[in-house]
């Protein structure tokens, strides 16, 4: 999977905590942040109005589905 670079502004406290976690887990900060973002996006679900894709009113879909619909 191709990866893109994203720049974040984090508090000094968040960086300290992230560094401790990095040392404990023996993985990079990028790996921890990538995992956290992926988990967050998985948990996010939004009600969607009836769309051309045959969804029913109020059906819940994930972020990926909404991104695809937005581009169409």
Swiss-Prot record:
UniProt-recorded Gene Ontology molecular function terms: sequence-specific DNA binding
Region spans: Disordered: 51-72
Gene3D superfamilies named among the record's database cross-references: Met repressor-like
GO BP field: regulation of DNA-templated transcription
Pfam families cross-referenced by the UniProt entry: RHH_1
Organism domain of life: Bacteria
Signal peptide range: none
Protein family membership: Belongs to the YiiE family.
Entry protein name: Uncharacterized protein YiiE
Source species of the chain: Escherichia coli (strain K12)
Gene that encodes it: yiiE
């Amino acid at each position: 999977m191709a990866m893109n670079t994203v720049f974040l502004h984090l508090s000094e406290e968040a960086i300290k905590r992230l560094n401790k976690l990095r040392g404990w887990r023996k993985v990079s900060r990028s790996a921890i942040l990538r995992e956290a973002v992926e988990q967050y996006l998985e948990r996010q679900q939004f009600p969607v109005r009836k769309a051309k894709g045959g969804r029913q009113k109020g059906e819940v879909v994930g972020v990926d589905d909404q991104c695809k619909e937005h581009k169409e």
